[in-house]
Amino acid sequence: MKEKSPQEKNAAERQVSLITEALSKAVDNKGVWLNEQGKQYPRFYPKGAAVSPFNALVMGLNSDKNGFSTNLYTLFSEAKKRDESVMAHERGVPFNWYAWNKYVNRHNPEDIISRKDYQELSATDQTQYKGIHNREIRVLFNIDQTMLPLKDKEKYEDVVKANVGANEDKALRSQVNDFIQKMKENLMAVRKDGSGVAHYDTEKDAVYIPKQENFEHYSDYVQEMLRQVVSATGHQQRLAREGMVMKNGIAPSEDAVKQEKLVVELASGIKMMEMGMPAKISKENMGLVDYWNRELKENPCLIDAIESDVNNALDAVSYTHLRAHETGR
């Protein structure tokens, strides 16, 4: 593995710190570890440019820890251009920025194309290529750390109002039902289960979820559904994550299984944040928090594996959801 730069090492330490602190807090917070205030998904201010799932996780955790009003962030230079400079002595949060200058064919390593050529491909053809990335660490600041709240209080309050608070119940349920329908049409079946136990059936390629009445809160039902969907992306026929795949008839190691459970909790939590809801650690996995925290702190490579697995899992889900909209389904 390529040696990390000092900036990458510092960023990784900060990312690990934010994740482990949040997981530890969940133990005494009824399992809630992310987006307790129901803020909307992290984005760049003011244009609203989207960010990767892992970056969104770090931005959301940083916002939670510091009590910021929104998950909206900006670069120091961009805030200065808007005459909304970052205030003195503020600490930013690391952002993993990838420069995708070249792309390689997933099935032919000798087929390498430029970014320009990649952008000219159809959405379907683009899926045949993956980026050859060069990672840079940028530093972002929440808009609460800028002069915006002081210089234009009314504008700031309007921005906060538009980016805080869970969706109205009817709209939220419609959003969740739409997501489930798109999963059924494009990724896997999502069915009701009478046994009372959520699970994924590999033979039927279907997720089974108990009725909503079996859960204390609607958000618990939604996140358990998301856990099962994320878990299903790791099976052999999809992303084949280490913790989900038999090799030569041998089951995954205990450590790999525990890491997979962390990926599922983080990825489903990020998706909950995208829907404007708080995320919880499941009761079944609460006992793994100390193990996860120890591994994240002691293994400097684990955070990179987590970033890759979380991004790939949610990209698989999001691409399927997006494709359904593009094809008019």
Predicted stretch roles:
Residues 324-329:
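A short, hydrophobic C-terminal helix/tail in secreted or cell-surface proteins
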Residues 1-323:
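N-terminal accessory/interface modules of nucleic-acid-binding and processing proteins
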